[in-house]
A protein has these predicted regions:
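Non-transmembrane, aqueous-exposed alpha-helical and coiled segments at domain scale
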Residues: 1-192, 197-309, 405
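Short, solvent-exposed amphipathic alpha-helical segments in soluble enzyme
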Residues: 163, 205-209, 272-276, 289-291, ...
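Feature captures the catalytic cores and cofactor-binding loops of soluble hydro-lyases/lyases
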Residues: 209, 213-242, 246-249, 343-475
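C-terminal binding/interaction regions
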Residues: 249-257, 264-265, 278, 446-508
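Short, structured beta-strand/loop micro-motifs enriched in basic residues and often containing a Trp
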Residues: 311-321
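Short, well-ordered loop/turn sites that connect or cap secondary structure elements
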Residues: 328-329, 335
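Generic structural signal for buried aliphatic residues
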Residues: 335-337, 341
Length: 508
């Protein structure tokens, strides 16, 4: 029997799903993170997981985004052959109208991150359209839809290899994961696609990430196929790398490994790998012609009773900070920042460097200040600023030396690790790099007491803001001597776990 899917039902269902995943983690993710928190032995990593879980509950209660990067929308549709759409526009246009409405919803405006003309103009589309949409035609009279929002930090760490038929997939994964740094915001998942062609392997990897986390169940009952054996082997060995939550070293780097495969040409073995971050966001629903889809929200009582103890953190007055005080900070120290910080990320840094190269004066005085790599969500209601978690710091590495040396900037705040060139620039300038927890954007935003755009307003969420913060939680990631916790801690925990020999990269 033919099923009629009405245009408004499709649009509203997509809109509702995008709002839903902006503030609700999937329940399986919450449970897996809770177990990771209970198991974790490294205090820094345990604190990071605690902040992610506390932020998750705050977002569920307040209906505000888990992460300021509310992602590029991925939509997977399985359309029954006996379905007829009652549309006045194309199916793509109807889905994108749902995206538009979802991101512009006045009660919970989501950050628009999608840029048109990617090679040249890179102009923000303002409503996060278009989505990346995939279709399958299947038997039946219903439409199954999966909606996901994929942030740049994890998506940018996607990997593809055209392996030889005899190459080891496990060896490739273990060689590749350390090169991804911590910008993908672990703990999360790795989706792995094996076979097909290059684009098929990547599609399989992305689709695998939509599956439910069930590694603990698999470990309890034991593997029942070679694929399950492979999942367990990769899971155990990746965690044995000791990368840990946010790259701080620890027992849990991945919560699960998901693998999908497809037949491939005899001459090769394509393998794609895509991580899902601590802001895992996806929802699944079905349209059967009866109206708008309903997605079951997790219950607040399902969230763990986790607290974050800040009593051992040092309070810092950024408006009166001295070089001597910064010299005393050690990697792993937790700080509570108070005072003035400026924001600036990719586009702002590019513009500042262009101005410096042209001999122009910058619109803000950064001498003795800290700059926070963030693109916040617009505020709603009485908020000072919307969710404002850190963006991946390595994208600013190429600007770091020039900005430090030209402005007298004291330090930077961002997400995850810094590359060798940035660490060297930090050391040479006796600066410092502080790390805020990725995936805890709403929690971080509560520390912002004042916010105003002070430069580059045309850049939208990439404008430079002046923030006044109160007890903003960060950790020292690179000290004035150039010692990086992301370089030292994983080696320590890899040795403690003891399953994989620690090899000094300098010896290779």
């Amino acid at each position: 029997m033919t099923t009629i899917i009405k245009q408004d039902d499709l649009i509203t269902s997509v809109k509702d799903a995008l709002q839903f995943i902006s503030y609700y983690h999937p329940q399986d993710f919450i449970q897996a993170m809770s177990r990771a928190y209970d198991r974790e032995e490294n205090k820094a990593a345990k604190d990071a997981i605690a902040q992610i879980l506390i932020n998750s509950r705050m977002c569920a209660e307040g209906h505000r985004p888990i992460c300021q990067d509310t992602g590029i929308v991925n939509v997977f549709l399985e359309v029954g052959l006996d379905v007829k759409f009652d549309l006045t526009m194309s199916l793509d246009d109807a889905i994108n109208e749902g995206v538009r409405q979802g991101y512009l919803e006045s009660s919970n405006v989501l950050r628009a991150s999608v840029l048109a003309d990617p090679a040249f103009g890179r102009k923000n589309t303002k409503d996060n359209t278009p989505a990346v949409i995939h279709y399958k035609l299947v038997p039946g009279n219903k439409v199954d839809i999966t909606v996901a929002a994929k942030g740049g930090g994890s998506e940018n760490k996607s990997k593809l290899a055209m392996l030889n038929p005899s190459d080891s997939i496990v060896d490739w994964v273990l060689k590749t994961v350390p090169t991804m740094g911590a910008g993908w915001c672990p703990p999360g998942m790795l989706g792995i696609g094996i076979g097909g062609t290059a684009e098929k392997a990547m599609m399989l990897a992305k689709e695998a990430l939509m599956e439910e986390i069930n590694m603990d169940e698999l470990l309890r009952r034991g593997p029942q196929s070679k694929m399950e054996e492979l999942r367990i082997e990769i899971f155990e060995k990746v965690n044995a790398l000791g990368i840990g939550a946010q790259g701080l070293g620890g027992l849990t780097t991945v919560l699960d490994i998901k693998i999908k495969d497809y037949p491939c040409h005899a001459a090769g073995k394509p393998v794609g790998m895509i991580p899902n971050c601590a802001a895992t966001r996806h929802a699944h629903f079905q349209l059967d012609g009866s109206g708008v889809a309903h997605i079951q929200a997790p219950k607040l009582e399902d969230y763990p009773a986790v607290t974050w103890d800040s009593s051992s953190s040092k309070r810092v007055d950024l408006d009166n900070i001295t070089q001597e005080e910064m010299n005393s900070w050690k990697p792993g120290d937790t700080l509570l920042l108070n005072g003035t910080i400026y924001t600036g990320r990719d586009a702002a840094h590019k513009r500042m460097v262009d101005m410096l190269n042209n001999g122009e004066e910058l619109p803000v005085d950064l001498k003795g200040k800290f700059i926070y790599y963030v693109g916040p969500v617009d505020p709603v209601g009485d908020e000072v600023v919307g969710p404002a978690g850190p963006t991946t710091a390595t994208r600013m590495d190429k600007f770091t030396r020039q900005v430090l040396e030209a402005t007298g900037l004291y330090g930077m705040i961002g997400k995850a690790d810094r590359g060798p060139a940035a660490v060297e620039a930090i050391k040479d300038n006796k600066a410092t790099y502080l790390m805020a927890v990725g995936g805890a954007a709403y929690l971080v935003s509560k520390a912002v007491r004042e916010a105003e755009v002070v430069a580059f307003a045309d850049l939208g969420m990439e404008a430079i803001y002046k923030f006044k913060v109160e007890d903003m939680p960060v950790s020292v990631a690179v000290d004035v001597n150039g010692t990086s916790i992301h370089a030292t801690a994983p080696k320590i925990w890899q040795a403690k776990i003891g399953k994989i020999p620690v090899i000094d990269a300098a010896a290779n």
